Amino acid sequence: MSRKTPLNMVRNIGIAAHIDAGKTTTSERILFFTGMSHKIGEVHDGAATMDWMEQEKERGITITSAATTCFWKDHQINLIDTPGHVDFTIEVERSMRVLDGAVAVFCAVGGVQPQSETVWRQANKYRVPRMVFVNKMDRVGANFFNVEEQIKNRLKANPVPIQIPIGAEDEFKGVIDLIEMKALVWEDDTKPTDYVTKDIPAELLEKAQEYRAKMIEAVAETDDALMEKFFGGEELSVEEIKRGIKAGCLAMTMIPMLCGTAFKNKGVQPLLNAVVDYLPAPDEVAAIRGELEDGSEVVVDSTDNGEFAGLAFKIMTDPFVGQLTFVRVYRGQLESGSYAYNTVKGKKERIGRLLRMHSNKREEIKVLYAGEIGAVVGLKDTLTGDTLAGEKEHVILEKMDFPDPVISVAVEPKTKADQEKMGIALQKLAQEDPSFRVSTDEESGQTIISGMGELHLEIIVDRMLREFKVEAEVGQPQVAYRETIKKSVEQEYKYAKQSGGRGQYGHVFLRLEPLEPGSGFEFVNDIKGGVVPREYIPAVEKGCQEALQSGVLAGYPVEDVKVTLFDGSYHEVDSSEMAFKLAASMGFKEGARKAGAVILEPMMKVEVETPEEYMGDVIGDLNKRRGQINSMDERAGNKIVTAFCPLAEMFGYSTDLRSQTQGRATYSMEFDHYEEVPKNVSEEIIKKRNG
């Protein structure tokens, strides 16, 4: 079977945005105009085809990235929906891995929001070429040119409008296409799909010429031949302009800007044309790199001919077909009924049915080709971030890094009968979401779930009830504290037991030093002349690592410590790995007590947007929560306060903020860094932990 859509006509794109910029509506309209969904789903009435999990319908926020295939001008567009809420940045990160290009949607009123900055940073990290769609041009306070300024100043990017709006707010009629120099006008609101091409209104001609000149200059900079033409005063043809925009977009030196209002169906078809014209095909972006089993690096080119290599980027439980694993094929082809090798787990997987998802319908297919995205039914051992490969070349594609959770709660089922069901439910949810962890508290035997924020865990508990029919009681949220040391110390420890028969003997000298925040643990072997034999060194490191699990102040994990083993002694008969492990572990604990151990707490970056009259209350409240105010700005007539606040003080913040501001303020919060806890708070934490 040969492929229906040539590789150069495939587009893998994501729609990325802040929570209320209208991302789902934009995705919906794309599906509508590409002829996939006939009735337009509205987020307001909870029927959007992209948002296919029930809670999303209720909360009106998009949680899981569903990959949906649609067609426009003979191009296959695989649309990967990314969530905009900060607790789900892991989802965004995961979808950025498999995208070739992105459409960043901004609200014409709200502009660049804190969440947009996070998503933008992730897109930069994975070098994803993108364009901007300024949405909600019909809203009161809409201003396309303000958003352009904010993208320059806040995101430090180079936005180049290739359209400008005709009017704004209720007067928003359409857009001026600066490439063709024509006005595209939506005249009849009852027929949203039809627009007319007209001459540019006289009062906007000067502005259009000014912005076209800026665009041409940006285009000329992408190519020497175009630059010569430009400086020679020659006109660039439409083809040359388009070629230049694409080159700038792929090199990420310019970001084409378009506008419209997805809700009112204005500006969506030109956006689709731009996706096809300017965003890259799989073979136009840098090839993904992988490593072989011997550690050597290989480049995995996008081609149908090589051996199969693909990345599992998302796992979902589907009520009808069971577990779905979403796979992006980078090289070769994946056929249903064949076998693939999971190179991360070292296991062979049988490929069952292959599905292509159309927002909420599934189409069964026989083959997935390079550059395509689909879902595999029935994989047993494959998790998010695993590589699937052919039999010959066991390549591992770039691994994904997932952050450690910062918040935990204890959960128990309402009825004892649900205990086993809850275990299965949590295990399945943890398979789908690597930033969610499940563990058991050794002392109390309680099940502990951990994640990236309160909303994250609320949704997990909610999904247990909806999808697995398990009702759970949730305990008080617990903060993931850490411990570290402040000064360097040297510590000797001798572990010796002689009581008839064979004894135990291990003797170590350790140097403990604090490291920069975020460095983790480092172990250095500095033994000279074999005073501690080589075979016992790993046991010393292991002993230190075990001691790190539970700190000396309150039993929290210890981090950012360097341990050097610099001296010691051993006994020909009585020394053993066990003895050295115990000596190191106890030596580490004694040393840590002298090294000024302190407790660290997760600090959240909090941004509150509030009407001016509540500004004083908001700041006063953040100060009460031990917040450090960073900056105060203005956006769309509101005040913006940015602060770092300890997570421990932020539980229930949304309710308090609502009552302080009569529901008129909004906030976003994401983990930023760990910081030392003040002494009085530290004493309380220790007292609570040690009873």
From Swiss-Prot:
Location in the cell: Cytoplasm
Gene Ontology CC annotations of this record: cytoplasm
Domain tr-type G span(s) in chain numbering: 8-283
Pfam families (alphabetical): EFG_C, EFG_III, EFG_IV, GTP_EFTU, GTP_EFTU_D2
Keyword Protein biosynthesis: yes
BP terms from Gene Ontology: ribosome disassembly
HAMAP family xref list: EF_G_EF_2_B
Family: Belongs to the TRAFAC class translation factor GTPase superfamily. Classic translation factor GTPase family. EF-G/EF-2 subfamily.
Protein's name in the database: Elongation factor G
Organism: Campylobacter fetus subsp. fetus (strain 82-40)
Gene (name only): fusA
